[in-house]
């Protein structure tokens, strides 16, 4: 009996940690992540809301980089959402999951994915707020320095989103004085597409920190699958889409880090601005209506 009990104990210890599907859902859209302790959190899905049966068939894509928040250090040719100089001068960072939790708010659910560096005392929380009555998910990041000295953040995106390659077009607004808000449609091609602002006070003058991705051809007003993204930030911003030799585009959004590295002292936490994400099968106007509802109810004073 003792030998049998010992064998069962050893079997239990040897079993690998099971990955957990973390579902972040509003009334009509879902963002699904694969979270396994000791491994990077990875994207599984973003789009129309899924049911329980759909969730069972999701697997992590193998023809792209699905890390939810890629850090600079282990795959240096790839674009990173986070890069830092540690207190000892090292530039390498790795982030693996340590768990997740969910908190209820009055009209939303906030999901937190906890990440940490296995070597350095750096903790990163990926935050997702899904509204119950509006098809909008806010994504932001909180970076905590537990090292003995100050670390320097050199890249600190709010979020990254992989988008499957195909006939994908990006719509955005640009302009100048007396000709603001000129709508442009750009087909995503290999390379990088960057929208950035360095002005500091007129950061909606020449461009806007918001884009829409039409997934099946040039953006149409009332038809087609569309991902919308808007950075809720009034300072210098950067939106960047990277298309490389994988089967995905990679969209990064956050504070423009150009000449703006941040010195994070021991014990301090840095919080990025939120990136608002939506999805619609009713074209550009469908995504726009989602932003309008969210903005009036939750962003604008007396909206």
Stretch-by-stretch model annotation:
Residues 278-289:
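Short, Lys/Arg- and Gly-enriched loop/turn segments at beta-strand edges
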Residues 269, 274-275:
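Residue-level marker of beta-strand positions
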Residues 19-21, 245, 249-265:
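Short acidic, Pro/Gly- and aromatic-enriched capping/linker segments at domain boundaries
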Residues 271, 287-303:
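An acidic-aromatic substrate-binding cleft motif
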């Amino acid at each position: 009996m003792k030998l049998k009990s010992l064998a069962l104990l050893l079997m239990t210890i040897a079993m690998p940690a099971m990955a957990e599907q973390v579902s972040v859902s509003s009334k009509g859209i879902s963002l699904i992540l694969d979270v396994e302790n000791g491994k990077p959190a990875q994207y599984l899905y973003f789009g129309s809301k899924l049911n329980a049966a759909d969730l069972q068939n999701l697997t992590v894509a193998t023809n792209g980089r699905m890390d939810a928040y890629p850090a600079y250090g282990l795959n240096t040719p790839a674009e990173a959402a986070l890069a830092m100089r540690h207190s000892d001068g090292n530039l390498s960072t790795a982030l693996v999951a340590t768990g997740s939790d969910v908190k209820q708010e009055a009209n939303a659910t906030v999901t937190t994915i906890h990440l940490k560096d296995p070597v350095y005392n750096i903790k990163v929380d990926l935050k997702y707020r899904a509204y119950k009555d509006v098809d909008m998910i806010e994504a932001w990041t909180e970076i905590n320095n537990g090292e003995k000295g100050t670390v320097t953040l050199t890249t600190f995106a709010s979020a990254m989103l992989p988008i499957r390659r195909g006939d994908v077009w990006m719509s955005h607004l640009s302009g100048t004085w007396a000709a603001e808000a000129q709508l442009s449609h750009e087909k995503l091609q290999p390379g990088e597409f960057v929208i950035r602002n360095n002005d500091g006070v007129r950061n909606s003058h020449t461009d806007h920190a918001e884009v829409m991705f039409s997934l099946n051809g040039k953006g149409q007003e009332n038809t087609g699958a569309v991902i919308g993204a808007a950075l809720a930030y009034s300072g210098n911003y950067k939106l960047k889409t990277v298309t490389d030799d994988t089967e995905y585009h990679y969209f990064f959004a956050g504070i423009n880090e150009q000449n703006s590295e941040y010195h994070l002292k021991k014990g301090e936490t840095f919080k990025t601005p939120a990136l608002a994400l939506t999805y619609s099968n009713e074209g550009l106007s469908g995504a726009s209506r989602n932003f309008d509802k969210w903005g009036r109810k939750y962003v604008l004073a007396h909206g």
